[in-house]
UniProtKB/Swiss-Prot annotation:
CDD domains: RecA-like_FtsH. Keywords: ATP-binding, Chloroplast, Hydrolase, Membrane, Metal-binding, Metalloprotease, Nucleotide-binding, Plastid, Protease, Thylakoid, Transmembrane, Transmembrane helix, Zinc. Disulfide bonds: none annotated. Zn(2+) binds at residues 456, 460, 533. It is found in: Plastid, Chloroplast thylakoid membrane. It is a multi-pass membrane protein. It comes from Ectocarpus siliculosus. This is ATP-dependent zinc metalloprotease FtsH. GO terms for biological process: protein catabolic process; proteolysis.
């Protein structure tokens, strides 16, 4: 307290010294201001008379003094009563208010007169009558602003010190900046259990021992086992990483502390590290608990990857996280869970044992996982009993849990919009198509464009149906959605491994739309509707050549895995292959695409009658279901059998080689 009083006294003296110094340096401005204020007071007459009256007063000796203002354009004079009462009227004796306050005066009010422009004889006239006169400069307040601006500097310095930097201040500027902007959520009970998490059973089994540790840590410590300090959940967006972390806290009955990785990053140096300390202090006060950091890649990126390897605020924040996790005691009861979909960019020091001990990957759900997820999200929705969740799961391959929840929510909105009581399969299908392709557009009325689109879409579907390695047709429609004038849906194979035959069939089927346009209408009538198809074909062919080794060029991959996308590293990477090899790769891609396009054209030319009838049918009914499409095709030609995995027999070697002993 005594030290604070001493500081305040010193601060007062410093402030007074600053003010005195500024006043001394600007004294000339103060004197100018004082003169201007006096001139301003006297230059405001309370009564104005004409110039003739002024001359009349002057000739009769009723004026004793004249003050000239505004470059002699205004004259203010004091008049007294003349002996001749008929000639002059006395000036009334009144009290007046000056410009800046209250001034009670016993003198006559000053009388003013406007002097005609360029009246050079006035000065001579005043001298002839021996009248005292004084000429004043124009009142100028420009000299006030430098004084105010200069005085403002020490005042602001004192205020800033008192508010932000003094001890005992009620307003901690940087403390509030550190804490107020960091949104740390503390939930005593998340209300989420493992039963609310579906489709990721493998990940749930891994987390069961975390729940056991939080409930009964003595079981681990009794046998000398150190509980895990942290775990990173890796997976695509919408796969339930945050929900899984909440379920762990809910099952264990411990507080759930969550924060986003972007909350640590600020423009002020040291703020991120300070927030990390505050976060772990909060966790220690509420232990045992779950500490969840979402999108940890915002602060956990590899260090030294910027241009020049400079150290920035993000690296300081990461260093603080590493230090805090090293400081955990075995019995602290804090488990740090982080979530990211970019595990490849994380720093290696963050992933070592003792910090984040485990890395659990959450994949997109398979058909059985999607069924379980649909069951969870359909609990509070009135879905028609005839609606098959398995059928919906078959139509939603590659969808995440968040996507499935969004589908049911969109279907519920469509049901309410149609004033229906239950959600039917029709609303669910419409919701799926809206999410994938966009809003439904207006049907084409032009018969020519409608036939062009019909042949294009039937070309995709028919080519895919007649290829034995292609996915099954799900739906063909002329109803526009988004930018597409028509759509052909296939049910993708969920197997993680793709054969060369499957990829080649997909390439040919994608080119089936342009092939149908060429076969039916000729080269001059091909449309721009295949632009997106060519983009997909080029990407697929390049992967087959450079990544999968499925070309005649070489059985090896000619494209290295892309490093983490950092500017500092990208400018140093060398090309994956020589320029002459790159030219050969481009030629191989062109050859594969041209070969696929030729095969698509041959397939459609051999089935020209079937192509015409399907296009006519699609033009009439506008939508054909996948099963109906296959039945229609099977009446004209046999459908290919799905390939079975065959083992190539070994060639008999005439030169028998003895086995080594």
């Amino acid at each position: 307290m005594k030290n604070q009083t001493t500081k305040n006294i010193i601060l007062v003296f410093v402030g007074l010294a600053l003010l005195s110094g500024f006043v001394y340096l600007k004294w000339d401005n103060f004197t100018d201001v004082g003169t201007n204020l006096i001139n301003l007071k006297n230059s405001h007459p309370t009564q104005m008379v004409s110039y003739d009256t002024f001359l009349h007063y002057l000739e009769n000796g009723a004026i004793k003094k004249v003050d000239l203002y505004e470059n002699a354009e205004l004259a203010v004079f004091d008049a007294f009563e003349s002996l001749d009462q008929n000639l002059l009227k006395p000036v009334p004796l009144l009290s007046s208010d000056t410009l800046f306050g209250i001034l009670n005066s016993d003198e006559f009010r000053p009388i003013g007169v406007k002097i005609p422009v360029r009246n050079s004889s006035l000065i001579l006239t005043l001298r002839d009558y021996k009248i005292d006169f004084t000429a004043y400069p124009i009142v100028n307040f420009d000299s006030i602003w430098p004084i105010l601006s200069v005085l403002l500097i020490p005042v602001l310095l004192i205020v800033v010190y008192r508010l932000f930097f003094s001890e005992g201040s009620n307003y901690d500027f940087f403390g509030n900046l550190r804490k107020a902007r960091a949104k740390i959520q503390l939930d005593a009970d998340t209300g989420v259990l493992f039963s609310d998490v579906a489709g990721i059973d493998e990940a749930k089994q891994e987390f069961e021992e975390f729940v056991s540790f939080l409930k009964m840590p003595q079981l681990f410590t009794a046998v000398g086992a150190n509980p895990p300090k942290g775990v990173i959940i890796v997976g695509p967006p919408g796969t339930g990483k945050t929900l899984l972390a909440k379920a762990i806290a809910g099952e264990a009955g411990v507080p759930f502390i969550s924060i986003s990785g972007s909350e640590f990053v600020e423009m002020f140096v040291g703020i991120g590290a300070s927030r990390v300390r505050d976060l772990f202090e909060t966790a220690e006060r509420n232990s045992p608990c779950i500490l969840f950091i979402d999108e940890i890649d915002a602060i956990g990126r590899q260090r030294g990857t910027g241009v020049g390897g400079t150290n920035d605020e993000r690296e300081q924040t990461l260093n603080q996280i590493l230090t805090e996790m090293d400081g955990f005691k075995p019995t602290s009861g804090i488990i740090v869970i982080a979530a990211t979909n970019r595990a490849d960019v994380l720093d290696s020091a963050l992933l070592r044992p003792g910090r984040f001990d485990r890395q659990i990957t959450v994949y997109l759900p398979n058909i059985y996982g999607r069924i379980e997820i649909l069951k969870v999200h359909s609990r509070n929705k009135n879905i028609d009993s005839k609606t098959s969740l398995k059928f919906i799961a078959q139509r939603t391959a590659g969808f995440s849990g968040a996507d499935l929840a969004n589908i049911l929510n969109e279907a519920a909105i469509l049901t309410a919009r149609a004033n229906l009581e239950t959600i039917t399969i029709k609303q669910i299908y419409t919701a799926i198509e809206r999410i994938i392709a966009g809003l439904e557009g207006v049907l084409l009325n032009d018969s020519r464009n409608k036939r062009l689109v019909a042949y294009h879409e039937v070309g995709h579907a028919l080519t895919g149906t007649l290829l034995k390695n292609h996915d099954d047709v799900q739906k063909v429609t002329l109803i526009p959605r988004g930018r597409a004038q028509g759509l052909t849906w296939f049910t993708p194979d969920e197997q993680p491994l793709m054969t060369r035959g499957q990829l080649s069939s997909r390439l040919i089927g994608t080119l089936g739309g342009r092939a149908a346009e060429k076969v039916i209408f000729g080269k001059m009538e091909i449309t721009s509707g295949a632009s997106n198809d060519f983009f997909k074909v080029n990407s697929l062919a390049r992967q087959m050549v450079t990544r999968f080794g499925m070309s005649s060029l070489t059985p090896m991959a000619m494209e290295l895995p892309k490093p983490t996308i950092f500017f500092g590293r990208s400018v140093q990477t060398r090309p994956d292959c020589f320029l002459d090899i790159a030219d050969k790769i481009d030629l191989q891609i062109i050859e594969m695409v041209e070969d696929g396009f030729e095969k698509a054209c041959i397939t459609l030319e051999r089935n020209r009658l079937l192509l015409d009838q399907l296009a006519t049918l699609l033009t009439q009914i506008e939508t054909i279901d996948g099963k109906e499409f296959e039945q229609f095709v099977s009446t004209y030609t046999g459908l290919p059998k799905k390939p079975q995995l065959k083992i190539v027999k070994a060639k008999e070697n005439k030169n028998k080689v003895k086995a080594p002993v």
